[in-house]
UniProtKB/Swiss-Prot annotation:
This is Biotin synthase. It comes from Yersinia enterocolitica serotype O:8 / biotype 1B (strain NCTC 13174 / 8081). One of its GO terms (molecular function) is biotin synthase activity. [2Fe-2S] cluster binds at C97, C128, C188, R260. Pathway: Cofactor biosynthesis; biotin biosynthesis; biotin from 7,8-diaminononanoate: step 2/2. Its EC number is 2.8.1.6. Keywords: 2Fe-2S, 4Fe-4S, Biotin biosynthesis, Iron, Iron-sulfur, Metal-binding, S-adenosyl-L-methionine, Transferase. It holds the Pfam family BATS.
Amino acid sequence: MANYLRWTVGQAQALFEKPLLDLLFEAQQIHRQHFDPRQVQVSTLLSIKTGACPEDCKYCPQSSRYKTGLESERLMQVEQVLESAKKAKAAGSTRFCMGAAWKNPHERDMPYLEKMVEGVKAMGMETCMTLGTLDKQQAHRLADAGLDYYNHNLDTSPEFYGSIITTRSYQERLDTLSEVRDAGIKVCSGGIVGLGETVRDRAGLLVQLANLPKPPESVPINMLVKVKGTPLENNDDVDAFEFIRTIAVARIMMPTSYVRLSAGREQMNEQTQAMCFMAGANSIFYGCKLLTTPNPEEDKDLQLFRKLGLNPQQTATQHGDRAQQQVLTEQLLHSDSLPEDSVQFYNAAH
């Protein structure tokens, strides 16, 4: 295994304190050493089981503990999920992420989850799931089905974590990431900016991620979307430059990871998103109308790509093909009509 730089919170905090333009310059230099700066990986997210989650994550409208008006739904049928995946591929996404609002999957659900992974893989798309805590057997079963990525965010620093979540320990999250990695599945893990954390907490989160035995292949950075009925509905807005700093520091600390703009993009203007790409972000959730939090519509994403000279990255899976790249290229040139989104699309990053 490659040797990765071990970071301290002090070192990470020093990056946050750099003059912004110096920080962006360093992040962009590092980004160009490892990635094509014009390529952006695009994913679509689907809620396969919505609401009624027993967890108490203070930011999440899917928790059964808060009255947010969200209607809970049972686990979707495999056929419904695959139909949504077809629409996502037709719209140009190269990775299909499936999220379920529960603490952990039950044994009765595993055969359906495996079929979902197998079906999406057969379409030539990368697969990702976020299902909560996994044990060793579950991780290996999903790996055998062909799962490419597993998302399980750390959310914030270990020190601040207990102020946001009490129903799942920080160590439990780290243990799940370890089981996923040991099963041969790529790790997707990041956090949220705007929970009420300090800059030191942001530094602490990124240190936890960067100092994993191997840094996550994908690091989603979310901006808190304040939902009425959740305990954080009245939190202060996140300063755009502070969010951009977080993207830049993540890029510097994890040079080979994809850094994803996740929840909260609807709150960002084009200039903020452009600076995030400049800071090293190179992945987005594309064209999904998120179930519990809004996300820019497909045509807006495509128009922004065109303005910035960005290109959607082609996937490389066992069953991959060039059709996805061609579809996106055509849409960038002629973004007049796009497939309808399912109302099931949402941000399941947590």
